[in-house]
């Protein structure tokens, strides 16, 4: 985003996702730790809020003060051509589909669990943290090169149909 390069967003970016701030996660976790009714049960600890991937990436771009150059690419294309990156499980099996959680189970055991950090605020905080901590900004030239190849392939496909 900072360099104005295309940002690959799987599919059309409209699937819903949830991001839970660590402070909000901690409220749920601590509430379950000493609760005997939690023993032997599985819980997910998430916010009730959802955003599309388009909204998530736009929020990050806004926090950076940069325009989002979104490049929507079919998830199965990314999975097939992921090379060294396993997009099958994480993308096709998880992030490409809308995920909205029912938090009623944890709220029965931890009734005061209220997520107070919105997804947008959490994303802005994360961006600011990363900008102020250069050690978190680890370049990955191999992944950048792969993303460039995907962007180039999409541009070639577009040009092939524009010629008609």
Residue ranges and their predicted role:
Residues 4, 35-36, 109, 129-133:
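Generic structural signal for alpha-helix termini and adjacent loop/cap motifs
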Residues 3-10:
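A short, charged helix-loop
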């Amino acid at each position: 985003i900072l360099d104005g390069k295309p940002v690959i967003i799987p599919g059309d970016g409209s699937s819903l996702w949830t991001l839970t701030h660590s402070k909000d996660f901690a409220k749920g976790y601590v509430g379950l730790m000493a609760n005997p009714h939690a023993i032997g049960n599985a819980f997910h600890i998430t916010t009730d809020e959802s955003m599309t991937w388009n909204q998530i990436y736009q929020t990050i771009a806004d926090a950076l003060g940069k325009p989002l150059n979104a490049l929507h690419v079919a998830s199965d294309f990314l999975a097939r051509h992921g090379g060294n990156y396993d997009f099958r499980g994480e993308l096709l099996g998880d992030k490409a589909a809308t995920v909205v959680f029912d938090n009623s189970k944890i709220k029965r055991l931890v009734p005061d669990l209220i997520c107070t950090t919105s997804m947008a605020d959490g994303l802005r905080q994360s961006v600011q943290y990363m900008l102020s901590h250069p050690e978190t900004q680890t370049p990955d030239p191999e992944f950048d090169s792969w993303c460039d190849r995907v962007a180039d392939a999409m541009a070639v496909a577009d040009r092939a149909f524009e010629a008609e």
